[in-house]
Amino acid sequence: MEHIRNFCIIAHIDHGKSTLADRMMELTGTVTKRDMKQQLLDSMDLEREKGITIKLAPVRMKYEYTSEAGAAPSTATRLVSPVDSIDGGRNTAPQPGAYDLNLIDTPGHVDFSYEVSRSLQACEGAVLVVDASQGIQAQTLANVYLAMEQDLAIIPVLNKVDLPAADVPRVSKQVINLLGCDESDIIHISAKTGQNVPQVLRAIVERIPAPVSPLAVQAERMAAQDGKTPSIPTRALIFDSYYDDYRGVILYVRVVDGTIPKGADITMMATGARGLALEVGHLSPTMQPDPLLGTGEIGYIVTNLKTTREARVGDTVTLKKYFE
């Protein structure tokens, strides 16, 4: 789990969230330039037509992190997270190597605050994108407060700094007043041209903590006390779901504890609905099947459920054997 980072991009409408996500996927080689199309994560026709994000689209990117070059990781915008107290400060300086960056590109329009809040629950951090010419807008504030309520690490990013209308000093001051961060913590980028986007990828690894399994930490403590290691039940948060005419109900989940293997008998803890995990995997950004979903990972589960009412957003998926 030390090489997993779960994060989202939050901002006001039209401040460049989807464009930044596109650049990240290009730089990490998740999508080739030949297959790239503008605002790739905005899968609905209406989204591309109107230029807004409605449906959450998670994607896993493989990023090779190196420790050379650049300043030491900043902690000024690192909000105190419950995982720090749970794992006893286990989230230390990142080690060089391959990292899984799990991105959820969230809506920025005022009407979709519920979609933002449910995606934040699946993350440890957020990239806050602010238009360098428009500054902090009302919806930006609303989303930042949602992130603060979830105790997420926040990485401030000023976008569109290459435009003539950009007022970097003024908007930087707004961000500093909002987050209480240093000016050096703010990354100045142009998502359209790709300027300084590699710095954002580095900051995600350096400033956002790795996921932690709360039940695994408790099990370790119990084992240290009495020498017995209890079993860890599987728990996965559903942050989105939809019905596919050919495959049934498909869930987007964040695995909090345990694992979900392909073929497992699963149960929804709130509704009591039971089903089968016909296929599990991650999205890069298309579905890529895996043998199982591990702790801390974000991915999908293809089920044999017939309606999304059986697997509601915010419900917890567990294995049948833990619910009997």
What are these regions (language model features)?
Residues 179-217, 225-324:
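Conserved catalytic-core segments of large NTP-driven translation/proteostasis enzymes
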Residues 6-9, 19, 23, 155, ...:
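Hydrophobic regular secondary-structure detector
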Residues 23-24, 115-118, 122, 139-146, ...:
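Alpha-helical scaffold elements adjacent to nucleotide-binding pockets in ATP/GTP-utilizing enzyme cores
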Residues 126-183:
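Conserved C-terminal guanine-recognition region of P-loop GTPase G domains, centered on the G4
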Residues 66-99, 213-231:
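Intrinsic disorder/low-complexity segments
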Residues 12-15, 25, 109, 131-135, ...:
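Short, ordered loop/turn segments at secondary-structure junctions
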Residues 33-35, 111, 137-138, 163-169, ...:
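Switch/connector loops and helix/strand junctions flanking conserved nucleotide-binding motifs
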Residues 1-68, 98-130, 136, 143, ...:
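P-loop NTPase switch module centered on the Walker A-proximal segment
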